[in-house]
Amino acid sequence: MKKHLYIFIAMLLSFGLKAQQNIIAHNSGNNMYSSSTSVIDSIKFDTNYSKFKLSGNSTTLDIQKTVIDSLTFTSNTVNLTKIYIIYNGTDNATIINPYSTQGVNITASGGTVNVVSTATINNLEYNLLGTSATGSLTMSSTLPATFVMNNLNITNTSGPAINIIGGQTHTFNLQAGTINSLTDGSSSTKNGTLQTDGKIIFTGTGTLNIKGIKKHGISTSGIIEVQNGSIKVISAASDGFHSEGYMMSNGTVNITATGDAIDAGDAAISISGGNITATLASADVKGIKTGTNTISISGGTINLALTGAQSKAINAKGNITFDGGNITANLSGAAVLTASGSGYDPSYSTAIKTDANIILNAGTLNLTLASTANGGKGISADQNITINGGTITVTNAGNGATYTNISGTLDSYSSAAITTDLNLAITGGSVTTTSSGTGGKGLKADGTVTIGTATGSPTLNIKTTGARFLVSGTDYSHPKTLVATGAISIVNGNNTFNSTDDGIHSDTSVSISGGTNTVNAISTVIGVGEGIEAPIINVSGGLTNVTASNDGINATYGTVSGGTEQNDNSQFNVSGGIIIVAGNDAVDSNGNITITGGYLIATGPTSQPEEAIDFNGSFNINGGTVIAGGSNANMTKAASTTSTQPNMFLKSSAQLASTSLIHIENTAGSEIVTFKPKNNVYYFHVSTPTLLKNTQYKVYFGGTYTGGSYVGGSTGWGLYTGGTYSTTGGTLKSTFTTSNTANVNTQSF
């Protein structure tokens, strides 16, 4: 068809048309070239080119036949508005320049093209086509320009494929359906295969493949903005993208580099859409990085894989904010100890790291650190971490280890799913973490931790499955699901903490005022596994269920040796809510216990010396409901005589089986408590607001309870409510009358 068209053109030219006609060569729907037929001496065709010979010119305009979509004629005036640079292998590039008299000067020597533009027209369009293994484009422009890349393939073994100076914003439009490629050479004196000193904008839906042999794939002292297109850095000796700022709203970026994938210098990064994939294998590199500035991610899909030591997937010195997006990061690089002071300073592989704050409002994060990433961190901030929404999953298998710190002291590090040097606040969203390495931490803060608000209810599922490891002497690094130097406040949420060692620990205090909270701290090591541990523990609301292999509740300053009765003035206070505890001891305070409201439901061990409730100071029951069953340890004491609510301390010589019940009622048959213990027990602490002075009560072991449920919805054991007790099959163990004056009533049977 095209051959017939060319014959037809030749016939028309040979006859010399009476009317003035213009011939137009089209490319990709555009008018690429036009000339009056009256000045065309001839059009010839060889293997590669259509050769246009104009009157008075000794040379021909050679246009590759493959880039001419069609030739048409018109009697209308044709205004060409686009510049074409067509690379022809080792032949001179074809230049079609309708602005040659308006300040645009273009020269070509083989595939080396130089453009100097002083034109006063914004965004002149340069269409780049063809192939050259020895080509380049160098341009100086005083105004922004647009480059349409239409199956452009340039390799420059001695410099950048494209180098633009002038500090202007330039747009690279990747023509739909095209595949373009740029490659530089090792002898280049520039930093990028595509290099500019101004902002770069990518548009279009075509593909651009880049090889950065010398250094970076794309390098600019301005911003890189990806609005669309598929950009693939196949390889880079250093960074894939190296810029001062990065923006992305659509398109696809795929980077394999020796250095960082995207290095935005000290300027901001904003990602609202598109897809980013990066594969990095070197040590101490970053997937997405800015220096002193911020990173904001509100959309898009990001997949980052880093295998080098101490690498970071997303890294900034400023704030990192997530308002959307789907982020996946996989890291496997080891920790690195750098000599400093009198020892070493460790650095770890980290999925998200900032020297400032991290704010997560929305989005999905899936962060994985392999077992080779010892000491690795999922999310780490030198300042605060605030999670208001989104779905976060961190899987961390890195082990901990000992090292000599910069002060010359033996120290240790361990992996952590989420860690901050200041405060952690989780007010919404879903957070799931698994830390399986030795000494691994789930949530860790050197400041305070707040979970939930009055209206914000997050979902937490925090798990540690690793073992403790010895640091020195009797000092171990313990796995902990939630640990803070400052106060921990649980206000709301559906929160589950599962640990093979410690559950919740604060050096200051733990306060629970709401939420549904489950803590399981189960260790195979004797004496290990604290459920909730802090000097001050306050429960004022919510539903909390604690199961521990050692102490369920441990109020301590850590200054009192085990087995002693010294009061360190620590506190366990219950003023509201429901707390259900099973442990060995269930409740242990090296100081005082005060109950003024709510429910305390506890089961201790069967065998002494551990107890259901162990305290060194006072145990005041001034309100609320208390039911606790434990061993017959000689150390077990009744509540303090300063209690203001009547209570019972019941000491049975016979064991109550965990399959049985203890039931207490008044002479009218009104139920005071019906309790099924988790373990076989002997001694009980009982108090409810309905318990009265100078009143006769009956105590039964056994019997049956129909209907109803356990307070707090516990499973298998607890305080019954809402059903009916029957003495059938039960044994009346004691009938007695409470004191007319004292609130503490001790009975043995």
Locate each region found by the language model.
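Bacterial Sec-dependent N-terminal signal peptides
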Residues: 1-22
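Residue-level hotspots within well-ordered secondary structure
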Residues: 37, 64-67
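A composition-driven surface/loop motif
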Residues: 77-749
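Short polybasic amphipathic segments
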Residues: 21-26, 50-54, 660-665, 697
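Short, hydrophobic/aromatic-rich segments at coil-to-beta transitions
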Residues: 20-23, 48-51, 121-128
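Surface-exposed loop/edge segments in extracytoplasmic proteins
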Residues: 30-34, 59-60, 668-676
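Short N-terminal segments immediately surrounding and downstream of signal-peptide cleavage
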Residues: 21-35, 40
